[in-house]
């Protein structure tokens, strides 16, 4: 398996040398983000892809423990280079998604898998949780952190249908550094205008209403974890499945 952090332009050059599933996953990602007629609604994500700011990594089956172990050093490396990649920095991780995972998992099963994987990944973190980010997911300023860097995360799966912006033929997780939103937030005219544009595109792209949990980081009523995994409908688990304290206990064993 090709194992590293890559740009779109590099993968285009070595496309025919990639293992089959990686080649197919990359081709589908390029089709999704690069389609001019059926425009992907996330403007920063699409711009990042088109301008080679996006970074792409491949990972194994997300159900296997070793996959989190293999991704951990890549995510730590990305945190060190993300500021050099552009103002719309993001890391898209494409996972090996065997047929039994792609075709027989419900959205609820994918949701459980996502949180289980995120916990496993956090178990590999060698750094302490940043002091300026609350460790409690129910705090309005919480964000997932790894190697000292906070990330907004979103998951796309083969199980999504109506919410097309979260649908992808392979299990996919995107890590967006928190600093990207320094100018993209509700306190700036640029951020508010961008939000209106994205919401307008979501209405046209998705076959589901805009999810009510989509909001601005730092808002007292906002919970970031509720935006990481959105089902086709508006149902959600009642409590965040991520637990940092539990992870710290595991590290000491």
Curated annotation (Swiss-Prot):
InterPro entries (UniProt xref): Uncharacterised_YqcI/YcgG (IPR014988)
**Superkingdom, taxonomy of origin:** Bacteria
Family per similarity comment: Belongs to the DcsA family.
Protein known as: Uncharacterized protein YcgG
Organism of provenance: Bacillus subtilis (strain 168)
């Amino acid at each position: 398996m090709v194992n590293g952090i890559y740009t779109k332009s590099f993968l285009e050059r070595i496309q025919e040398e990639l293992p089959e599933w990686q080649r197919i996953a990359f081709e589908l990602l390029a089709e999704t983000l690069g389609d001019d007629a059926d425009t992907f609604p996330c403007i920063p994500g699409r711009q990042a892809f088109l301008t080679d700011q996006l970074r792409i990594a491949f990972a194994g089956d997300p159900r296997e423990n070793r996959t989190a172990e293999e991704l951990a050093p890549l995510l730590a490396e990305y945190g060190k280079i993300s500021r050099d990649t552009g103002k719309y920095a993001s890391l898209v991780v494409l996972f090996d998604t065997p047929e039994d995972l792609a075709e027989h998992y419900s959205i609820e099963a994918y949701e459980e898998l996502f949180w289980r994987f995120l916990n496993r990944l956090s178990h590999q973190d060698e750094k302490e949780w940043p002091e300026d980010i609350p460790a409690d997911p129910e705090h309005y300023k919480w964000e997932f952190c790894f190697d000292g860097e906070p990330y907004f995360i979103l998951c796309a799966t083969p199980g999504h249908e109506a919410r097309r912006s979260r649908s992808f033929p392979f299990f996919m997780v995107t890590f967006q550094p928190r600093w990207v939103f320094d100018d993209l937030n509700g306190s700036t005219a640029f951020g508010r205008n961008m939000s209106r544009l994205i919401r307008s595109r979501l209405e046209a792209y998705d076959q589901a209403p805009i999810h009510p949990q989509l909001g601005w980081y730092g808002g007292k009523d906002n919970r970031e974890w509720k935006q990481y995994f959105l089902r086709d409908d508006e149902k959600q688990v009642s409590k965040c499945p991520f637990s940092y304290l539990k992870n710290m206990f595991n590290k000491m064993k």
